[in-house]
Amino acid sequence: HTAKDFHNQSVNPPVVRASTIIFKSMQHIRKTQVKAKKNPTGGHYDYGRQGTSTTYILQKILTKLEESYHVFTTPTGFGSVFLAIFSVVRPGDEIIAADPVYSPTRILTQDFLKQFNIKTIFYNPSDLKTLEKNITKKTKLIFVENPGSNTFDFQDLGKIILIAKKNKLLTAIDNTWGTPYY
């Protein structure tokens, strides 16, 4: 029911593909940019990389389906992994990640983040005591894949989240191989 497009009288909203957004004047662009700053999730676009009305409607639908405050969509799954990690960590911070992880995620966390003085510690997903032992004052995030990319092993998310809450840490879960039910 969220996707109804009463303006165009269609059952589902039309798919809008655009990289360039057209405006009537520079003044109109500036007004849109001011609105976007005040409400970044409000569907105000001045360039295609910010999304279109289609992505905005998708976010609204997913927000309702997932019963969340907001959903942010990215063009790729790995883009969302990158965004989730980079929105949390800063130089000097640490991440604890389940091993094994998706190869590009390993390269990001093990190699790329080093350049920013961000350390990643990998733990055996079947040994949550090791996870707890590796938490330090610098730890900001526990990163989990469920099921695991290479092994398809399932981790005890309930216990991991309890550990995270106890230590006031955020968790990020890559659910690529799962479904909304995992």
PLM region spans:
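Conserved PLP-enzyme active-site core in the AAT-like
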Residues: 71-182
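Pocket-edge structural micro-motifs
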Residues: 17-21, 49
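Alpha-helix initiation/capping motif
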Residues: 6-8, 47, 51, 124
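Short conserved active-site loop signatures built around small residues
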Residues: 1-16
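Residues at alpha-helix termini
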Residues: 8, 65-66, 116, 167
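Conserved N-terminal alpha-helix of the aminotransferase class I/II PLP-enzyme fold
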Residues: 25-79, 107-111
